[in-house]
Amino acid sequence: MVQHLTAEEIIQYISDAKKSTPIKVYLNGNFEGITYPESFKVFGSEQSKVIFCEADDWKPFYEAYGSQFGDIEIEMDRRNSAIPLKDLTNTNARIEPGAFIREQAIIEDGAVVMMGATINIGAVVGEGTMIDMNATLGGRATTGKNVHVGAGAVLAGVIEPPSASPVIIEDDVLIGANAVILEGVRVGKGAIVAAGAIVTQDVPAGAVVAGTPAKVIKQASEVQDTKKEIVAALRKLND
């Protein structure tokens, strides 16, 4: 199973990162004689521009040239952000629109991350694992291979306090919708976590747990294969 950054490494990374407040500015006006800073990315025509820049760089630019502008619309979706979204260019997985995957998360080959899922810094999505809609992998949460994390489920993150152990999900585990796996819990290979369960203690390999707090109710070997099947076709990428 892939291991990634320690809590201390993540904390140092966030502390050292240059905090960013990127904005997108839509402008109409007279742009004659305007000099744009090198940090600006500028697109558009003679009468209309779209500018990508940092909020702190925009202020002096506007003070210098604001009288030449007409309509202005500014979009800002973060403030002093330390962690950008992950560059997915070389990720060999299926990532659907609306998934939020932060830099320093690992997405292994053949994984699937569905709409609305959130993968925080230091988290690991194992090979062939599916993270369903609106599920959350907190900081350093780690899944093995061929895991299914159901819609709305939460694998709690542990960056603060740094001494806490991360959630570990071993291979071939099924986690039902809206289940919650608390900090430090390890779910053993082939286990099944029922929908809505709150897991506060380690789950033995091959066990089925349910309830609040979750308790072992039977063994995965007693569950019909059709109810615990991981479908390879859903992980298939282009040939």
UniProtKB/Swiss-Prot annotation:
Record has Heme as a keyword: no
Superkingdom: Bacteria
GO BP: any one term: lysine biosynthetic process via diaminopimelate
Annotated Pfam families: DapH_N, Hexapep, Hexapep_2
Catalyzed reactions per annotation: (S)-2,3,4,5-tetrahydrodipicolinate + acetyl-CoA + H2O = L-2-acetamido-6-oxoheptanedioate + CoA
Keywords from the UniProt entry: Acyltransferase, Amino-acid biosynthesis, Diaminopimelate biosynthesis, Lysine biosynthesis, Repeat, Transferase
UniProt pathway: Amino-acid biosynthesis; L-lysine biosynthesis via DAP pathway; LL-2,6-diaminopimelate from (S)-tetrahydrodipicolinate (acetylase route): step 1/3
GO molecular function annotations of the record: tetrahydrodipicolinate N-acetyltransferase activity
Claim: Repeat is one of the keywords in the record: yes
EC number in record: 2.3.1.89
Homology family: Belongs to the transferase hexapeptide repeat family. DapH subfamily.
Summary of the function given for this chain in its UniProt record: Catalyzes the transfer of an acetyl group from acetyl-CoA to tetrahydrodipicolinate.
Annotated protein name in UniProt: 2,3,4,5-tetrahydropyridine-2,6-dicarboxylate N-acetyltransferase
Organism: Staphylococcus aureus (strain MRSA252)
